[in-house]
Amino acid sequence: MAMIELGFGRQNFHPLKRKSSLLLKLIAVVFAVLLFCEFLIYYLAIFQCNWPEVKTTASDGEQTTREPVLKAMFLADTHLLGEFLGHWLDKLRREWQMERAFQTALWLLQPEVVFILGDIFDEGKWSTPEAWADDVERFQKMFRHPSHVQLKVVAGNHDIGFHYEMNTYKVERFEKVFSSERLFSWKGINFVMVNSVALNGDGCGICSETEAELIEVSHRLNCSREARGSSRCGPGPLLPTSAPVLLQHYPLYRRSDANCSGEDAAPAEERDIPFKENYDVLSREASQKLLWWLQPRLVLSGHTHSACEVHHGGRVPELSVPSFSWRNRNNPSFIMGSITPTDYTLSKCYLPREDVVLIIYCGVVGFLVVLTLTHFGLLASPFLSGLNLLGKRKTR
């Protein structure tokens, strides 16, 4: 009787062992693909990015000096979903992608300052105080950074509303979290951060206040370029003498994206669509005011979710920064800038493509299905089928 029970136990042991072996294989494959697609792929993509080289010597005709280089990252249009729009899985997926991309970039590239060019949130224009607090908490978790890295943010239309939706409460709510700073100087470089939503030019209270602030910034910049101690500038501290870098959400006026090119430019069928002033781009008048008041050497903007490079007046370059989120484009990216008081060089760093990640997942699912069916004898092993076919050909 004991021998019969022992034999019965051995007969059941082999199927259990085979099932355990299959389960371990499935778990190992799933773990490996999750590790690669959710973590390692970001290191693989961003590891290929390097800070661009920039000339670090400046000469005033008499002597040559070595200038400090500021490493700055520029990204735009993160569009964190709120409580109304978007499926929870969409929110989870896109926010995880941005968090991993940002944290990986911080670790590998070690920037000194990061600028986000508006539309931080998707529903800031209508979110309740409770929803706003939740959105801010998620943003601060996703874009957490060491104390030695500065994070600067400008407002976009989804953060405070389009001009007709904007009000003092929304603007102050945004500035309470992200500061109302308009002028930021570091390592001899001036950055002017503009609330471009408030440049409608219709004399609204917020618009008038914004223009007054910009005129004051213009005055300070002009004083920095004049002889030290000028009577019209007063006794206060002077800014660095370098021409500023202008940062805003709306692009300066351009007719369309017809002259834009590159793999992350707008789709070809959309490039000739005319832009609406104060909706897609700033008005022609507001753009001329900014260029006249600030005399920037470089402009960076967001809003369009696509890349474009244009030159205003043939001399002032503007770069539209593509969206940082998979929700807005399949191939998100950010800009890396090596900037000195007299020069700058920019390069683009591409994040993993969403379609590549989805193809990997679909391929692995197919592989696991084939592996499972083969294991239970429901599908002939492709390897064995190949050997049998090869054997038949040899016998002929």
Swiss-Prot record:
Changing H303A: Affects transport of GPI-anchor proteins. One of its GO terms (molecular function) is manganese ion binding. A motif (Di-lysine motif) lies at residues 392-396. One of its GO terms (cellular component) is endoplasmic reticulum exit site. It comes from the Eukaryota. InterPro entries: Calcineurin-like_PHP_ApaH, Metallo-depent_PP-like, MPP_MPPE1, PGAP5/Cdc1/Ted1. It is an enzyme of class 3 (hydrolase). Optimum pH is 7.0-7.5. CDD domains: MPP_MPPE1 (cd08165). Binds 2 manganese ions per subunit. It is found in: Endoplasmic reticulum-Golgi intermediate compartment membrane. Its cofactor is Mn(2+). Coiled coil: none annotated. The chain crosses the membrane at residues 27-47, 356-376. Expressed in brain. Metallophosphoesterase that catalyzes the removal of a side-chain ethanolamine-phosphate (EtNP) from the second mannose of the GPI-anchor protein intermediate. Participates in the glycan remodeling steps of GPI-anchor maturation to allow an efficient transport of GPI-anchor proteins from the endoplasmic reticulum to the Golgi. Belongs to the metallophosphoesterase superfamily. MPPE1 family. PANTHER family: METALLO PHOSPHOESTERASE RELATED (PTHR13315), METALLOPHOSPHOESTERASE 1 (PTHR13315:SF0). The di-lysine motif (KxKxx) acts as an endoplasmic reticulum retrieval signal. This is Metallophosphoesterase 1. It comes from Homo sapiens.
